UniProtKB/Swiss-Prot annotation:
Cofactor(s) for this UniProt protein: Mg(2+)
Matches recorded under Gene3D superfamilies: Nucleoside diphosphate kinase-like domain
Principal subcellular localisation of the protein: plastid
Stored CDD domains: NDPk_I
Domain of life: Eukaryota
Compartments, record wording: Plastid, Chloroplast
HAMAP family to which the protein is assigned, alphabetical: NDP_kinase
Source species: Pisum sativum (Garden pea)
Name under which the protein is recorded: Nucleoside diphosphate kinase 2, chloroplastic
Enzyme class, first EC level, given as a word: transferase
Residues reported in the UniProt entry to bind ATP: K90, F138, R166, T172, R183, N193
């Protein structure tokens, strides 16, 4: 026991010195590791200007002429003419429950609905709408048909809405209308051809002004608009 105590005592100072040296190296290694892990300030962000080394000069990137050309199609698209079309579901289309189907086809095409109402058309309004046909032998029968029940008046808006609407609707004579068109799919006779659509942008504006009063149209922006055109 005494021998062991003497041996331990003789080496006590050396052992203590070794432990102190080892602990110092460990703390120094931990300190360097912590400093390396803390390269970014706690208040900084990897993508913020403060995270950029001050030894590198800051530069500002300007758009080149070749890059600006990418946006030219968008500029052209923004200048495209947005037209209006008046679409009316006639009494037979309303009675047959085709209003939803017709609206769906125009919506799926990407056009914007700005006016919609269901009402009973008066004789005076029908005669004004079809005044270009007042010399035709079928005119009285046409007026009787349009006023025989409620109609659904719609105002649609979009680039090329008038010619596109005519294609969606189909030929006046349902027997000549292509399959896939509204008249081609749902009508069989000219006297019951379900739907009316403006035949020109000018008539579209005129008919909308005739069938809708001031304040009845709604101006809005569909969320799908950026996905319709470049």
């Amino acid at each position: 026991m005494e021998a062991m105590a003497v041996f331990s005592g003789s080496n006590l100072f050396a052992t203590s010195s070794l432990l102190l040296t080892t602990n110092s190296k460990t703390r120094y290694s931990q300190l360097r590791t912590t400093q390396n892990l803390s390269a970014f300030s706690s208040k900084s962000h990897l993508f913020s200007p403060s995270s950029t080394s001050s030894s590198y000069p800051k530069t500002f990137r300007t758009r080149s002429s070749t890059e600006s050309g990418i946006f030219l199609p968008r500029l052209i698209t923004s200048l495209e003419q947005v037209d209006q079309a008046y679409i009316m579901v006639k009494p037979d289309g309303v009675q047959r429950g085709l209003v939803g189907e017709i609206i769906s086809r125009f919506e799926k095409k990407g056009f914007k609905l700005t006016g919609l109402k269901l009402f009973q058309c008066s004789k005076e309004l029908a005669e004004e709408h079809y005044k270009h046909l007042n010399q035709k032998s079928f005119f009285p029968k046409l007026i009787e048909y349009i006023t025989s029940g409620p109609v659904v008046s719609m105002a649609w808006e979009g680039v090329g809405v008038v010619p596109s609407a005519r294609k969606l609707i189909g030929a006046t004579d349902p027997l000549q209308a292509e399959p896939g068109t509204i008249r081609g799919d749902f009508a069989v006779q000219t006297g019951r051809n379900i739907i009316h659509g403006s035949d020109s942008p000018e008539n579209g504006e005129r008919e909308i002004a005739l069938w809708f009063k001031e304040g009845e149209l709604c101006e809005w922006t569909p969320v799908q608009e950026p996905w319709l055109r470049e």
